[in-house]
A protein has these predicted regions:
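Local beta-strand N-terminus motif with an aromatic residue
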Residues: 2-3, 34
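Hydrophobic beta-strand segment of the Class I
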Residues: 6-7
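Non-catalytic DNA-recognition/assembly elements of restriction-modification systems
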Residues: 10-12
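Conserved Class I SAM-dependent methyltransferase catalytic core
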Residues: 14-74, 78-88
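C-terminal substrate-recognition regions of SAM-dependent nucleic acid methyltransferases
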Residues: 72-142
Length: 142
């Protein structure tokens, strides 16, 4: 079965100890949409790296075009990390970049999620630079 569009907020765990259920769901859906898919899931996925996570990243690279970070407070009463709105597009070309818009002003454009998302230290530095008068004017904002 194929869908023109998929919009989803997949479950994150199954209650039986299975983690990253949302990644399994999104991975399955990547093969089921014809045009676009918009998924809400934790932004922390981008910073994780292991064999299983990298398998998902490689699959997502084929159609992921944009990720925008939002504070998790949009879901009242949650204690989860910030969330990302992930936009997938089947018309993505091989040389199209993946644009990742983090809270604040910094944006990354990557060829692949496997290129590496910066670590906590880099994030702390960028956050500092965004708030410092002397440096904030030099940070790219989309």
């Amino acid at each position: 079965m194929k869908f023109d569009y998929i919009i989803g907020n997949p479950p994150y765990a199954d209650g039986k100890g299975v983690k990253n259920l949302h990644l399994e769901c999104v991975n399955y859906c990547v093969g089921m949409f014809n045009n676009k898919m918009v998924i809400v899931m934790p932004i922390t996925f981008l910073k994780q790296s292991n064999t299983k996570i990298n398998k998902f990243k490689k699959t997502f690279d084929s159609s992921l075009v944009e990720v925008t970070e939002y504070k998790s407070t949009i879901f009242e009463g949650t204690t989860m990390p910030n969330i990302g709105v992930y936009v997938f597009d089947k018309s993505k070309k091989a040389d199209d970049k993946i644009n990742i818009h983090y809270l604040g002003k910094h944006t990354l454009s990557l060829s692949s999620l496997l290129d590496g998302i910066y670590d906590k230290t880099t994030n702390d530095i960028l956050s500092y630079l965004e708030t410092s008068k002397d440096y904030s004017k030099h940070i790219y904002s989309s």
